[in-house]
Amino acid sequence: GTCMRTSPSLSELQSRFSRSIVDGAADGLLPWISARGIEPSARRQIYRNAVLATQVETLATSFPAVQRLLGDACFDGWATRYAAWHGSNSGNLQHLGHDFAEFLETRPELATLRWLGDLCRLEWLRRRTILAADAQSLDVATLHASLLAAGDDPVIQLLPCVRSLASGFRVLDLWHFSQSPEAVAVDPDAGPQALLLWRDAGRVAMQECAPASIAFIRALSHGATLSKAVDAAMRIDAGAELAQLMVPLLDNALVRNVVPASFQLPASLHATREHP
């Protein structure tokens, strides 16, 4: 006998269509798309192209320095491949690009641009810094009193907007060069750069710091106690001293709170994608 094809429900069709737009696979969907003068595959591709274009535009907004240094055509090509490979299952594109650096680093064609991944990471950190929640920093007097009250080995909690990056390349110099390409060309292999980022008056501030200071700040961002954060710094520089390590945080008023170690949150709640 003849087998009747069972029509999928509306919700099933909607789910298939959504998956098709994200991953490009149209299995089980095309037979249920009415042609109406345009082939079903072409009709679906119109929607997919529109979604990809939106995602590429979002990536260009998130990674302007990468776009400038690669050139528009090259960037658009790789951003389109990333969007097609990665997709976004959400209408909220805020997190699109979180692994763009890793994607570019695995492309053999870009292997000679070894700095590209870290420049992506810097731009992603800039984005996360802007989007971070607001919080009030401690003034010097309150910070001093809080340190005394918190005991021997407190936890120093930083503002939510604080981010850090330790790179083997001159990524901050590259970023500045991308803003003013008429400046002297940058040698990305001239040495490592360790960077502190925060939000100041609604804009991203960036400062090059000693690698030990960034190790210290990164440990604090993960919820480490003060002594463990100093230990992390001393693994980079055996002569690191607490007073010097605190300078970037004090100069820029980046401390939100000081609590006894017994009050600290589990480390898993402090760890973020930006602080590996």
Enumerate the predicted regions with their spans.
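Short acidic/polar alpha-helix capping motifs at helix-coil junctions
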Residues: 25-30, 193-195, 249
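Hydrophobic packing positions characteristic
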Residues: 84-211, 215, 274
